[in-house]
Amino acid sequence: MKTSAYVKELQAQSVEQLQAQLVDAKKELFNLRFQNATNQLDNTARIKEVRKNIARIQTVITAKAAE
């Protein structure tokens, strides 16, 4: 999914949905880091992608709180 489409999708969601999505993304990041530490992770670029998605979600949550 393209970044701009993903951000627009995030902006359309409620804060509660974003919070739930943030928790899921953080759990995924934890699992990816664990897999990477045990040399089971094939696609290490996924860690960077998930980190960026977490930042995008947090940015949208902050913007909605400021409104």
UniProtKB/Swiss-Prot annotation:
Disulfide bond residue pairs: none
Record keywords, A-Z: Ribonucleoprotein, Ribosomal protein
UniProt-listed CDD domains: Ribosomal_L29_HIP (cd00427)
Single GO BP term: translation
Pfam families found in the cross-reference section: Ribosomal_L29 (PF00831)
Gene Ontology annotations for the cellular component aspect, listed alphabetically: cytosolic large ribosomal subunit
One example GO MF annotation: structural constituent of ribosome
Superkingdom in the source lineage: Bacteria
TM region positions: none
Alphabetized PANTHER family for the sequence: 60S RIBOSOMAL PROTEIN L35/50S RIBOSOMAL PROTEIN L29 (PTHR10916), LARGE RIBOSOMAL SUBUNIT PROTEIN UL29C (PTHR10916:SF0)
Family indicated by similarity: Belongs to the universal ribosomal protein uL29 family.
Protein's UniProt name: Large ribosomal subunit protein uL29
Native species: Agathobacter rectalis (strain ATCC 33656 / DSM 3377 / JCM 17463 / KCTC 5835 / VPI 0990)
